[in-house]
Amino acid sequence: MKVHIIGGGIIGMSTAYHLVKQGVEVVVFEKDPAYTESSFARSCGGFRAQYFTKTNIQMSKYSIDFIKNNTDVEFTSNGYLMLFGKDQKSDCDASTILQRSEGASTVAMTPNDVSSRFDYLNVDDLYRGCITTDGSEGWCDPVTLHKWYKDNTKCETLYIDGRELDHNLADAVVITAGCWSNQVGKQFNIDIPVRPHKHTVFNVSTAKPVIKDMPLVADLVTGVYLRPEGDGYIVGYDGNGTYDNKDLEPDWNSWDEVWEHLYHRFPTVFDEAKMTGAWAGYYDQSTIDNNAIIDNMFNFYFATGFTGRGLMHSPAVGLTLSEMILDKPTTFNIDAYRLNRHPDLEKYVI
């Protein structure tokens, strides 16, 4: 069996890895040899099981376990702290119940509990702070994980210049082209409802020493998320996204707003903060419900629309695509990811 994969980013290489393990001949087609525009290379690398839909939780748990137990990629298990405001009570309560029912060790801390454990946080406007207790959540280096897939996958990679290619010799064609999946799909008369959503991440230094054991903090009240990195922090913000892929110029003008949110939530940490750099990257955003699109039409398969979860779910998605292509039962129920699904909104995209 021969499979062509269009898109050699994190999803494409995970799919190649899982197929090659099953004895499939794979050719990967990639337009960006240095992966300079690839979304995985511009990710903050976060991994969490705290999601709002069942299959997303299951895929996260599988993927975290895969990376920790099957690769030599270093994983920083500082945790993933999600902060909910007082008007987000129902979402917090429902998601905590769902996550625990799926085996996640999520605990919902009161503001006093949050303050006792993380004394650098302002908790005045919080309802709860949620974190898992088993040390499973955290982050890894995205480029290192991608390299691990490539180093452990014996397949041919062809670097192309955007021209249309003849895939008639392939038994299956897989589209894993991120935010470009829609335009790739059109070459095969397939409409894949995904669009590019550009986000900016800032490098920030502070006058005080970095809090090395800080978890990745996702402030769902302000939309800011951050984690320690080297001698500073990397900070993202869901309020500075734009729907285009014209360029990768950061949204420098949003820094003042980001700093205000940082100072509000971390008053003793970012009181003397300095923005030292920034970069931008694309989410491949599903226009259906912010959940992934994993489906096939005859011998064309596609996985995209992860809206920031591609790196995080890459082991599970690669496994799923390999099972679909080889006509095996899928480990995960992907009905929620099919094109004809009933939308089930994944909330708080960060």
What are these regions (language model features)?
Residues 2-27:
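N-terminal Rossmann-like FAD-binding beta1-loop-alpha1 element of flavoenzymes
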Residues 154-167:
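A conserved short coil-to-beta-strand element within the FAD-binding core of flavoproteins
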Residues 36, 170-215:
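Central helical "cap/lid" subdomain
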